[in-house]
Amino acid sequence: MSRTGYTLPVFAAAAARAALLHLIEKVPCASVQLDLLGEQAAIPIEQVARLDAETALGVTRSDPGDNLDLTRHTPVWAWVHLEVGTGEVLRLEAGEGLGRTAAGEAAIYRYARQLMEANVAPLVPTGRTATVRFILPEGRALALRTSNAAFGILEGLALLGTSGLSQPLSAADHLESFRAALRERAERERRLVFCIGAGGLQAAGRLGLDQGATVQTGNWIGALLVEAGMLGIESVLLLGYQGKLVKLAAGIFNTSSHVADGRLETIAAGAVAAGADIETVRTVLEAPTADAACALLAAAGWAEKIYAALAERVSGRSVEYVRKYTERTMAVATMLLDRQGRVIARDRAAAEWLAEP
């Protein structure tokens, strides 16, 4: 059975709460209880240290459970300093290893701030302000293995996420739970929206799509497309991050990077088919991430044409895949998103899907 862990903002909030409790109560702290805005969690604390009368440091370590997450076991520090009130209860800062946006702001996003308001702000003594500086000693090095820089997070990791739970969506024993959810939806719906990742699910909400027709897929897009075909589903809209979905254009229907990649090669092939010059194709192949490739193509004026064609090919290959394994024809439409969940391309079938009542 796969083990659920927690996202990075949870450990940041836990370290901050532990440091502030130690500063106020002057007692050791082996764990802290956190309100995850819906449920409670006990988070182990590795160390707390009082640095002076007004300053303490809390240290914990990231544990994403069985999810494939590069932050596993990375240390998370929170430096907390109390001072005479300045009109705000909490001041959050980025220390070493926590990224900043291109505008220089700390990469601390909404859910992380909500956790801090719920779990740290109530502990701040009346008339005081707590400055919390998050430090990720390995963050700068780990960020080099992500696509953070491609969407504006520089010099470190981000406290990013919409939930405290880190679900192991790529673990093999979760496929059956996805299939069960699909079967449940198929009992009442003939058209389904396959949401690839949390970004796909959030985009479905923003686009006003029927939440009762959404199905999360993890990396098993091919298996679930076939299941949908066997269940007699009429059509499926694929909605997700382009770096995942373009793999389907190359016939890769398990999108885990541990199974196969080929993203840049597929995008480069799309550039060739669109008539891009050889230098543009070369820059795609040399791009560090799929996001970077997309940005390069946008700057060169090629992105719209290339990704629209890739979306068409994703749908076409998906229809062929379902027909091959079920001998049935199921319509498929595709919308490609960037890392922020914005639509960068859709095929004609997706445009028709959105136009229907």
UniProtKB/Swiss-Prot annotation:
Gene Ontology molecular-function annotations: cobalt-precorrin-5B C1-methyltransferase activity
Record-listed E.C. numbers: 2.1.1.195
Gene source species: Gloeobacter violaceus (strain ATCC 29082 / PCC 7421)
Annotated pathway: Cofactor biosynthesis; adenosylcobalamin biosynthesis; cob(II)yrinate a,c-diamide from sirohydrochlorin (anaerobic route): step 6/10
Assigned protein family: Belongs to the CbiD family.
SUPFAM superfamilies membership: CbiD-like
Identification of the protein by name: Cobalt-precorrin-5B C(1)-methyltransferase
Single GO biological process annotation from the record: methylation
Reaction equations catalysed: Co-precorrin-5B + S-adenosyl-L-methionine = Co-precorrin-6A + S-adenosyl-L-homocysteine
Keywords: Cobalamin biosynthesis, Methyltransferase, S-adenosyl-L-methionine, Transferase
